[in-house]
UniProtKB/Swiss-Prot annotation:
It comes from Haemophilus ducreyi (strain 35000HP / ATCC 700724). This is Ion-translocating oxidoreductase complex subunit A. It comes from the Bacteria. It is found in: Cell inner membrane. It is a multi-pass membrane protein. GO terms for cellular component: plasma membrane. Its EC number is 7.-.-.-.
Length: 193
């Protein structure tokens, strides 16, 4: 049980997919202008990443390995992720039309979020069992959501700040992301496996 908790903490804080592995940078930079949008995107990504990890494990274990079709892994995982994203899009559209409108194009773009595919492929490469796969996906999603919301809050503060002209826009956003990455390096050594 403790190992599972440490896996989630390690994946969310120490080996954060955005700040350490540089996966999921497109939504990180694109959706992080308002905290409300970042929270919605974080919740949708958490749902998709967790389900994608579960589905990828099941597809790998019960379809690809028995059929000796591991060479189709990437293609099949992309199809599975696309189905899960469509399901998520329908759920968000029905439950929160405002959030659906705010997320706009970024919701269907979860399909091409490299963090989602990266987690699914890393689960296979790390030979995680079912529970570890789901927790790894959940931890990655929690880390992604945490960083997304924190970055959105910082960008809202920066929008009201007097930033020098050469640093306005993407420049200050990248500098802020770099400082966040340095801050998250402080978690290194928190979990010893």
């Amino acid at each position: 049980m403790v190992d599972y908790i440490l896996l989630v903490i390690s994946t969310a804080l120490i080996n954060n997919f955005v700040l350490v592995k540089f996966l999921g940078l497109c939504p990180f930079m694109g959706v992080s202008k308002k905290v409300e949008t970042a929270i919605g995107m974080g919740m949708a990504t958490t749902f998709v990443l967790t389900l994608a990890s579960l589905s990828a494990y099941l597809v790998e274990r019960f379809i690809l390995i028995p059929l000796d079709a591991q060479f189709l892994r990437t293609l099949v995982f992309i199809l599975v992720i696309a189905v899960i994203v469509q399901l998520t899009e329908m759920i968000v559209h029905k439950t929160s039309p405002t959030l659906y409108r705010l997320l706009g194009i970024y919701l269907p773009l979860i399909t091409t979020n490299c963090a989602v595919l990266g987690v699914a492929l890393l689960n296979v490469n790390l030979s995680n069992n079912l529970i570890e796969s789901v927790l790894y996906g959940f931890g990655a999603a929690v880390g992604f959501s945490l960083v997304l919301v924190l970055f959105a809050a910082l960008r809202e503060r920066l929008a009201a700040a007097d930033v020098p002209r050469p640093f306005q826009g993407a420049s200050i956003a990248l500098i802020t992301a770099g400082l966040m990455s340095l801050a998250f390096m402080g978690f290194t050594g928190l979990v010893k496996l």
